[in-house]
């Protein structure tokens, strides 16, 4: 049986017409969903349907914005800051986390969740 984090280690969802906020939120690990929910909803309020791609790789969240959006430059800056912050937030609980180089997929985890994850992998 896979670890509950496994589906989130590498994930890409794209739609050129815009991803609904509900789709983005339901495809985030719970720690990131809780931490970034408000910001993602505000991005959509400012520029509806501007988020066209969600990508999770190596413990970092990437959200791409439609280039034809009126607020493309602003949204790109906001989503870039969100990506940088996601690299310091535990995917499981939303507390401070970090990516460890020795991990194959480098999930961003706090110490307790990291220990749980490596113990699970070794079992």
Placement of each model-derived feature along the sequence:
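Detector for the mature cores of small, proteolytically processed
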Residues: 79-81, 86
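Short functional micro-motifs and their immediate structural scaffolds
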Residues: 96-101, 115-118
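Long, charged N-terminal interaction/targeting segments
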Residues: 1-76
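Short metal-coordination and nucleic-acid-contact micro-motifs, chiefly zinc-binding Cys/His arrays
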Residues: 86-89, 97, 103-106
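Cysteine-rich micro-motifs
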Residues: 104-116
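Short cysteine-rich clusters marking metal-coordination/redox-active sites
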Residues: 90-93, 110
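Catalytic-core loop-and-flanking beta/alpha module that positions acidic residues
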Residues: 84, 92-95, 119
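Extended, charged helical/alpha-beta scaffold domains that provide interaction surfaces
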Residues: 4-5, 118-121
């Amino acid at each position: 049986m896979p670890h509950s984090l496994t589906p989130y280690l590498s994930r890409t969802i794209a739609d050129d017409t815009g991803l609904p906020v509900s789709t983005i939120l339901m495809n985030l690990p719970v720690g990131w969903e809780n931490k970034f929910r408000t910001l993602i909803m505000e991005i959509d309020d400012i520029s509806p349907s501007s988020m066209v791609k969600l990508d999770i790789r190596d413990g970092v969240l990437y959200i791409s914005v439609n280039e034809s959006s009126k607020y493309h430059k602003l949204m790109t800056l906001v989503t870039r800051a969100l990506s940088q912050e996601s690299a310091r937030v535990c995917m499981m609980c939303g507390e401070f986390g970090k990516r460890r180089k020795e991990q194959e997929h480098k999930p961003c985890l706090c110490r307790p969740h990291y220990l749980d994850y490596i113990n699970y992998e070794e079992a």
